[in-house]
């Protein structure tokens, strides 16, 4: 059985406009991650461009739009996103495309930096590290896991349409962490 993969292609040095290119690939016998499928496609077409690094969902570098939903290719099982035998891969929306699935993250990082995502204290720094109680650490569960992949922010139309005014969900999460003073 074959899979039909529709891949967003754009090389500004060659292409006037982006286009979707269709690839046929034999459906793997066992379930694989979307990143594994991209690597298989790249073996046949070395011009395909995308980011990848850790393959563990830790670095966030392989964020992309997978069948209409933003996610990390390295931890997204192919079986969970296939529509029949079809898969569509696009770059994260709302950010400029550098090439194929690679976006320019400058706007995302600039918005994130606006909220000053670092420890801010009115008191003098201690001679040693600042201590955090286990109870305060527990309050962070579900809040500190953000890996800055931009999947949430680039899913948000307000981030696309008002990049100069709205910092986006990732930056708002960091701002919240600063506000709760843990």
PLM regions: where:
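Eukaryote-biased recognition of intrinsically disordered, low-complexity regulatory segments
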Residues: 2-22
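Flexible glycine-/small-residue-rich
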Residues: 7, 66-68, 91
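Short secondary-structure capping/turn segments at boundaries of alpha-helices and beta-strands
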Residues: 11, 24, 48-50
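Extracellular/mature segments of secreted proteins
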Residues: 81-83
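Ferredoxin-type iron-sulfur electron-transfer modules in oxidoreductases and energy-metabolism complexes
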Residues: 31-46, 85-180
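A generic structural signal for short beta-strands and their flanking turns/coil linkers
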Residues: 21, 58-60, 85
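Short, contiguous acidic and Ser/Thr-rich linear segments
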Residues: 22-32
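Local cysteine-cluster metal-coordination motifs and their immediate loop/turn environment
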Residues: 49-79, 143-161
């Amino acid at each position: 059985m074959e899979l039909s993969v529709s891949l967003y292609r754009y090389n500004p040095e060659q292409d006037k406009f982006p286009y979707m290119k269709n690839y046929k690939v034999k459906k793997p016998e066992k379930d694989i991650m979307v990143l594994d499928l991209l690597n298989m496609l790249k073996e046949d077409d070395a011009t395909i461009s995308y980011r990848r690094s850790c393959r563990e969902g830790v670095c966030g570098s392989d964020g992309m739009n997978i069948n209409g939903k933003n996610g990390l290719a390295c931890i997204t099982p192919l079986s969970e996103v296939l529509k029949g035998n079809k898969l569509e891969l696009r770059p994260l929306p709302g950010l400029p495309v550098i090439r194929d699935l690679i976006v320019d993250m400058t706007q995302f990082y600039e918005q994130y930096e606006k909220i000053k995502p670092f420890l801010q204290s009115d008191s003098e720094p201690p001679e040693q590290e600042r201590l955090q109680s286990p109870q305060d650490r527990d309050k962070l569960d579900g809040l500190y896991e953000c890996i800055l992949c931009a999947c949430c922010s680039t899913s948000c139309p307000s981030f696309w349409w008002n990049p100069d005014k709205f910092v986006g969900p990732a930056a708002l999460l960091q701002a919240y962490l600063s506000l709760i003073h843990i």
